[in-house]
């Protein structure tokens, strides 16, 4: 045991404390939806009593109870701000969270383990919005998300198209020449394969890019790094050894922002009969060149069903950029389409009415 090793241990503990503090404040923010106000004196007394009973000899009781009073005061202050809440899949620092912050910088972001949990949280009113990836230029459509989109009653309130730039991250001061192992999600590892092989690194599959970054920040395994976003590096205090290490520069992900109701800036979902269709252009870009709309139609599994939908858009002179059919149940299909245009264009409105 040396001074250096003890300080490394302290750094790891500090990182965990900060992560747990953030998690506690998030849970407090979620409770705001289930009570009439931020102040609950009975609950506060219960928490302080439990803290007092569990105080250990190294931590004075007055210190621990005072600390928790400050934490609860901060929690109440955050709740009183009545922030919009956006749920995303993954851990803090995930690309989904970066997309959420790009769409609504003032909102609070809430992590969920599964895509389905994001949908459920919006439906339950626990969060105002959910953001999910629907398509990646390298990996194609996100099948799990599209399968849920077919059946959900949520509306798409907006979209974010984001460049995905992978970074090699390590603890500050780490010697990059000593790096031997790199942790990340399997998809990120595959997208950076040439860089990994060229530098003689061993890729280790992790459940999440942001999770890998957090592990490196908290555990600091010797000779190890993570592949994650610049956002994750800033969040976990990691050093960016190398930016843009993905094999292909054309790596972009499109995200949908989900809500119970479409935002006022939009005209509602493209398939108004079902209340669950596409994105109506990037938020704030309606009616401008470069708008991109998405819609989903439901059709029987019979000859000519797909052609009937596509013919409408061809006759209207609307350029389709994506066509995909997904089976929903025996004999039925959902047809996903993306097309250039705005949901405020007269030609688009008429085409959607005819196709729907």
Locate each region found by the language model.
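Domain-level signature for soluble enzymes in the chorismate/prephenate branch of the shikimate pathway
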Residues: 1-356
